[in-house]
Amino acid sequence: MKRIIIYIAMLGMLCSCVDEEQYSDSPRGNFEALWRIFDEHYCFFSYKKAEYGLDWDAVYQKYSPQFSDKMTNAQMFEVMANMLSELRDGHVNIYSTFDVARNWSWHEDYPQNYSDSLMRIYMGTDYKIAAGLEYRTLDDNIGFVRYSSFSNGIGEGNLDAVLSELATCNGLIIDIRNNSGGNLTNAEQLAARFTNKEILVGYIQHKTGRGHDDFSAMEEQRLKPSNGMRWQKPVVVLTNRTVFSAANEFVKYMKCCPNVTIVGDKTGGGAGMPFSSELPCGWAVRFSACPMYDRNKQPTEFGIEPDHNVAITTADFLDGKDTIIEFARTLFK
């Protein structure tokens, strides 16, 4: 059986590119090139049309009159950024020499549900560090692991050490709030510690043509158990809206594992494998090209719901308590 998309080295980076027709290096030429790149290669048109009425042809008609040969580069960049914001996709960017166009509404329009100051209270100063993981035992004998970015590498030895250290705990909390993604291999590697058998965790498709719905058949994503130490006790994964991309995939995997509960806010999503291209002016463009789904073949582009939706309350915050962590601790009693 295949490992989970072993050919993806990094979800959230420029991981492939496409060849494009030749357009002139003018505001009009760059606009036409940009619109065409997305028209032929972006993967969520039909899904987002159903979700909120996205019409890419209407987007063309809306923005085309705004481009003229008298525009400055800054003006061209601004209009292009506004056009791409219609896609509501955190994996969509334009990289110029002076700015990066991005859409962060997937977390900026929602409560943060995370606090660095509260995290310092829970972690203290005597926590341990194993590569990208910070961990300790809380005073009620619950193991606590903080993983802030899947860009931070972890090795099998690191995971063995952490799980061995926390082996006598009654349960385990994995806090990935504010983790906006990184290396998908790290997400798979960590999730593999929480299943004793190979399991189906989702599906992926690939673009096969230039039509909006030209895709391959769905291919299975399967998670194999680690050959190292595996955790057999209850696990709670903490999430908020800033959980995105590879971190969103990790939540998808963990929802398929036994004894796992997701607590916090809906994740930010980001379920398209990003590809890249280039405009005539030399600016790089990134976009979602390969859609990924959960094990029920449902899109996770706009996020994954937790098992328990919990938010940090003002009263708890002022009292030095993280409502989400405190709720998670009650699940082990």
Named regions from a protein language model:
Residues 1-24:
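Bacterial Sec-dependent N-terminal signal peptides
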Residues 18-39, 74, 141, 180-333:
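C-terminal "post-core" interaction segments
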Residues 11, 166-168, 229:
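Alpha-helix termination/capping residues and helix-transition junctions
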Residues 9, 177, 243:
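Flexible loop residues that form catalytic
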